[in-house]
A protein has these predicted regions:
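Secretory targeting signals
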Residues: 1-5
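N-terminal small-residue-enriched
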Residues: 6-515
């Protein structure tokens, strides 16, 4: 509808609709509850152990869900516990846990989707929800399975120690270490805040075609924010790291690297200036610049936007969209990545989808519904925020592959331009792909050399146009380590993104002479 065409903020605040990519500095949960500790192995009978339901109950609910007909149907059981901790000036200023449990019931008939959810996993409650969801249909009963066959557990992010077994007494010393390191790195640092989040999530998906998928999805993220003062001038910066990992992942070395980055990003701002404004070549630094790839280009490659004709790429499959050394991939199967998934939220195996190969648009990202509409196999891209939502095509780990150039060659080729390194917020219009990004850290390039740090810069452009204007791609591709969260149509999911150093031949830079 029209709402997908509206401009939407994506880093500054939440958006009701459309594409949102945030890296929140902190999130607060609410309501501390005890969750039963569950051993991290795939149980013999996942129904009984995780959700207190069995084959017969599930079959009964599926039968009710498909009673008026169904092309597809699924039950999405979810239990998650998220823990949050904040350390400010040596004091724990907040500690909370957020527990979610429920089941989402979906039936799909042609173009229509019926959806209902309940937090109550008793049979009467699930049957009532199934009747609500199936009310959109008025056909003949679909054949529902009596039993479900379990698919093997994936091993992209197996952990030995679940987060439910890790106490505050273990997390706090690490947070205090981060704070102490930040303060010791520069005497100008006067305030440090450390934000911790960890999550144990278990999902179980039963489908109309008799599949049963279980996935245990751990997640953790630590963010440090640094505020420094020189005379009257105050600057701040942050850094974070996130992964589907366990407690042991947080080594001193890894935390140190994160702190160093936050302090460096903060201190350089005291010497940074605004660059001249106008049209110029822009170098996007490796890693975090994946935000442009994800936001301004990736969303346009999600099948639902193309099916509705909203995306500029809707008639471009098989056509040239970039130079021949540009390849863009969405891959959920990168171990331990924040955006990694063994299975998507429809129970399809997650995989690797080449979106752009050697400059040619090859595929969209599909969920079950869009794949059927295009007469293709799903790409394992059906994702949802929780059991309260129906899935839709979403990205996982989205990145551009290595190219034939080097970072040095790219810098040497620029007479006058800028390098963009870190980003804080912006807007994107999904259909056209028009974007504005706010660059927090960057560098001025003059006569093929990096000359001075810059700050307070806006870059303005069009995603598909910028993709076409990438004239050099370096061989230093990397995924950003930060904890990115992507929002679309009001649903947030964790993602990863990355890119090598690339040169965009022309982009509008808002600097000195812009209001």
């Amino acid at each position: 509808g029209l709402s997908t065409m509206k401009r939407r903020e994506f880093l500054g605040g939440a958006a009701a609709s459309g594409a949102v990519l945030t890296m929140p500095v902190f999130l607060s949960g609410c309501g501390i509850q005890q969750a039963a500790a569950v051993a991290d192995k795939t149980p013999e009978n996942p129904f009984m152990e995780w959700f207190g339901v069995d084959q017969a109950t599930t079959a009964r609910v599926m039968s009710e869900l498909s009673a008026n007909g169904a092309d597809a149907a699924d039950l999405y059981f979810q239990h998650s516990r998220t823990n949050y901790l904040t350390l400010e000036d040596g004091i724990v200023s907040s500690a909370s846990s957020d527990i979610q449990q429920g089941v989402g019931l979906r039936v799909v008939i042609g173009e229509q989707t019926g959806y209902a959810f309940t937090e109550d996993l008793t049979l009467p409650s699930m049957l009532a929800a199934a009747r609500t969801a199936s009310a959109i249909a008025s056909g003949n009963k679909a054949v529902a399975p009596q039993t479900f066959s379990a698919l093997g557990a994936g091993d992209l992010y197996r952990t030995a120690v679940p987060w439910s077994d890790v106490g505050i007494d273990q997390k706090l010393p690490l947070m205090k270490f981060v704070e102490a390191q930040a303060k010791s790195m520069d005497e100008a640092v006067e305030k440090v805040a450390v934000y911790w989040a960890d999550q144990d999530e278990r999902v179980m998906i039963a489908t109309l075609d008799g599949r049963l998928v279980t996935d245990h999805r751990p997640m953790t993220r630590v963010t440090v924010t640094v505020t420094a003062r020189r005379g009257e001038e105050v600057q701040s910066g942050f850094s974070n790291i996130a992964a589907r990992e366990e407690f042991g992942w947080y080594t001193e070395e890894r935390l140190n690297t994160m702190v160093r980055e936050a302090v460096d990003r903060t201190m350089v701002l005291f010497d940074a200036r605004r660059p001249p404004a106008g049209e110029m070549p822009v170098i996007l630094a490796s890693g975090a610049s994946g935000i442009l790839l994800h936001e301004a280009i990736g969303h346009g490659m999600e099948a639902d936007f193309n099916r509705k004709g909203v995306s500029i790429y809707s008639d471009m499959i098989g056509k040239k969209v970039a130079e021949p050394f540009v390849t863009v991939v969405d891959q959920a199967t990168i171990p331990r990545e924040r955006g990694a998934l063994n299975y998507d939220d429809e129970g399809n195996e997650a995989g690797r989808t080449v979106l752009v190969e050697d400059g040619i648009l090859k595929s969209y990202l599909h969920d079950t519904i869009s794949a059927k509409q295009y007469d293709l196999q799903p790409t394992g891209s059906g994702r949802r925020e929780s059991y309260k939502y129906a899935p839709m095509p979403r990205m996982s780990c989205t990145f551009m592959e290595d190219g034939p150039h080097t970072k040095e060659e790219i810098i040497e080729s620029v007479d006058r331009g800028i390098i963009c390194e870190t980003y804080t917020n912006g807007q994107v219009q999904i259909g056209a792909g028009d974007y504005t990004f706010y660059v927090k850290n960057g560098w001025l390039v003059e006569n093929g050399k990096v000359t001075a740090p810059i700050k307070d810069v806006n870059i303005i452009g069009n995603g598909p146009e910028s993709l076409k204007r990438i004239t050099m791609v370096a061989n230093d591709a990397r995924l950003d380590t930060g904890g990115w969260t992507c929002g679309k149509n009001g649903q947030s999911v964790p993602v990863s993104q990355g890119i090598p150093t690339v040169l965009v031949s022309k982009m509008t830079v808002g600097g000195e002479n812009v209001g």
